[in-house]
């Protein structure tokens, strides 16, 4: 489905929260949305690797990487695996890499920046906890929508207005 965040904001002003404008769109899908699954980690993408292996149909992985600009939490192999397993998109409060390949992948990806260095895999992080960045709290089971205009969060699923 194609989402337009300004239209969703206009149709549901009482429901949406808008994330501060700090993200760039890197994925092959220019818009995406779905149920939130969260990861909180810092320069360790072990849980990202685990989650993209699972069925992600109708879901968006929201990764709170602490805003680190020193390591990439997502690369082409994990993005391709996420697309294969039906994930709608991934939002990374941190960096990604392999951006040219990710731009060709059928997956929505928004992140702060790109960085060529991968993370360590120490198995450290938290799954499905509330995470806060960009002035908004992302809660598992709520919904996130993203496009080139920005990222919004809602406590319930939203439909594009007619």
From Swiss-Prot:
One of its GO terms (biological process) is regulation of RNA metabolic process. Gene3D superfamilies: Ribonuclease E inhibitor RraA/RraA-like (3.50.30.40). A divalent metal cation binds at residue 98. It comes from Pseudomonas aeruginosa (strain ATCC 15692 / DSM 22644 / CIP 104116 / JCM 14847 / LMG 12228 / 1C / PRS 101 / PAO1). It is an enzyme of class 4 (lyase). Homotrimer. NCBIfam families: NOT-MenG, PRK09372.1, PRK12487.1. Belongs to the class II aldolase/RraA-like family. Substrate binds at residues 75-78, 97. This is Putative 4-hydroxy-4-methyl-2-oxoglutarate aldolase. Its EC number is 4.1.3.17, 4.1.1.112. GO terms for molecular function: 4-hydroxy-4-methyl-2-oxoglutarate aldolase activity; metal ion binding; oxaloacetate decarboxylase activity; ribonuclease inhibitor activity.
